[in-house]
Amino acid sequence: MQCIETNNLQQLLEQVKPYTKKGKLATYIPELGNANPDDLGIAIFHKETEYIHAGNSQTLFTLQSISKVITLALALLDRGEEYVFSKVGMEPTGDPFNSIIKLETTSPSKPLNPMINAGALAITSMLAGKDNEEKMERILHFVREITDNPTINYSSKVANSELETAYLNRSLCYYMKQNGIIDCDIEELMDLYTRQCAVEVNCIDLARIGLIFAMDGYDPYKKKQIIPKHITKICKTFMVTCGMYNESGEFAIRVGIPAKSGVAGGIFGCVKGEMGIGIFGPALDANGNSIAGFKILELLSAQEGWSIF
């Protein structure tokens, strides 16, 4: 596959930049409302030539829903497929990511998949560790290993901002506790979940996460398997079917690669056996995806022939 060059990325960002004006920040999490809606950055981490980047590629932002892929991988390592999927389903949903509707109307009453908030909260409740400090340290260690960046941490400011306003997520937790999906203390779970969502990365870190998943869990630079192949396969399948909120189907048609977005404006994607892509653009479309980030990936995929379909 032909290697993309930095000047191509810079030209692409200039071409797509006007799209940022069409999006809006995720102001329902107060701290995310402080981002610059004009920011736009990209990094591509290749299996052989390291990375290229352009724009606001070194600006820190929080993982938010991108962390759901990380914790799913950890929960599968900790508990195994049988247990994880006895509590959380495997099917996409046409409802908003924070909806309670399917929990009430689906039988058995379990979240449809790990990429919606209810499913992600159930997944986080499964993580091994004696307390939240140990569990959070495991999440951070995992992200640091995948990114090869030992400085990665979480933003307590963003975590606290989310914790103070997470009324709907608390509702999801109480409903799941009533139905035996989770059995832990709700406030402790909310504390851990908001911290996991507040892990800070930049586009280069995100692209390296994408590379590890593109290589089926193998790190071509450290020459070692970081995540078992079968676990990355499960994660990438969910990324295709549910990774871009209610635009997952359209994204599959227009871009056609496994990807996961977050409401801080991040998107990471993977091109199998080749590279990972990390994008930051906090101006979001109506579905909660980076509006310019989606367009960048659409143009790159068409240009480079990335689609898996």
Curated annotation (Swiss-Prot):
SUPFAM superfamilies: beta-lactamase/transpeptidase-like (SSF56601). The keyword GTP-binding does not apply. One of its GO terms (biological process) is glutamate biosynthetic process. It comes from the Bacteria. InterPro entries: Beta-lactam/transpept-like, Glutaminase. Its EC number is 3.5.1.2. Keywords: Hydrolase. GO terms for molecular function: glutaminase activity. The keyword Secreted does not apply. It catalyses: L-glutamine + H2O = L-glutamate + NH4(+). Substrate binds at S65, N117, E162, N169, Y193, Y245, V263. Belongs to the glutaminase family. PANTHER family: GLUTAMINASE. Homotetramer. This is Glutaminase 1. It comes from Bacillus anthracis. The gene is glsA1.
